[in-house]
Swiss-Prot record:
Composed of a long N-terminal alpha-helix and a core region rich in beta-sheet structures. Before the pore formation, the alpha-helix binds the lipid membrane, partitions into the lipid-water interface and stabilizes the monomeric molecule on the membrane. Finally, it traverses the bilayer, thus forming the transmembrane pore. Pore-forming protein that forms cations-selective hydrophilic pores of around 1 nm and causes cardiac stimulation and cytolysis. Pore formation is a multi-step process that involves specific recognition of membrane sphingomyelin (but neither cholesterol nor phosphatidylcholine) using aromatic rich region and adjacent phosphocholine (POC) binding site, firm binding to the membrane (mainly driven by hydrophobic interactions) accompanied by the transfer of the N-terminal region to the lipid-water interface and finally pore formation after oligomerization of monomers. Belongs to the actinoporin family. Sea anemone subfamily. This is DELTA-actitoxin-Oor1b. It is found in: Secreted; Nematocyst; Target cell membrane. Its main location: secreted. It comes from Oulactis orientalis. Residues 6-25 are annotated as: N-terminal region. PANTHER family: BRYOPORIN.
């Protein structure tokens, strides 16, 4: 993982991350821009399917963006890159970010969501399911936005391809 200036987050940065992952059939470059006014501290990443070779950036200051990536497990296995990230925010709440790049596009599509949870909460299967079965956004090559509560709003975009990009901006409402 890495931290960059929030204003620098864009599709060229994501493409660089995807290229670094090599010839993996299911992979995702994730960028989350912190414009919340506070600092975020990494709690953990939970993978329902797949893995990563990078470390979740520990701190994300205001006006900076975190870069992260996920990929299917190596070898001839039927897995995608599916999971959730959790960051503890300086306001005492937790930001959860769910991503899903499935193995089988005959049955599934790309999905993503972002939510603020009250208090401190680590990413786990329950957080993943809550975000997936709540009101997630499809990875449909379009921008989506909603209020997150706690004075914040989220706006994001996800590609529909198996080599996907997820870009999220968390700002003051």
């Amino acid at each position: 993982g890495a931290i960059i200036a929030g204003a620098a987050l864009g599709f060229n940065v994501h493409q660089t991350v995807l290229k670094a992952l090599g010839q993996v059939s299911r992979k995702i470059a994730i960028g989350v821009d912190n414009e919340s006014g506070g600092t975020w501290t990494a709690l953990n990443a939970y993978f329902r399917s797949g893995t990563t070779d990078v470390i979740l950036p520990e701190f994300v200051p205001n006006q900076k963006a975190l870069l992260y990536s996920g990929q299917k497990d190596t070898g001839p296995v039927a897995t995608g890159a599916v999971g959730v990230l959790a960051y503890y925010m300086s306001d005492g709440n937790t930001l959860g970010v769910m991503f899903s790049v499935p193995f089988d596009y005959n049955l599934y599509s790309n999905w993503w969501d972002v939510k603020v949870y009250r208090g401190r909460r680590r990413a786990d299967q329950a957080m993943y399911e809550g975000l997936l079965y709540g009101i997630p956004y499809g990875g449909d090559n379009g921008w989506h936005a909603r209020k997150l509560g706690y004075g914040l709003k989220g706006r994001g975009f996800m590609k529909s391809s198996a080599q996907s990009i997820l870009e999220i901006h968390v700002t003051k409402a």
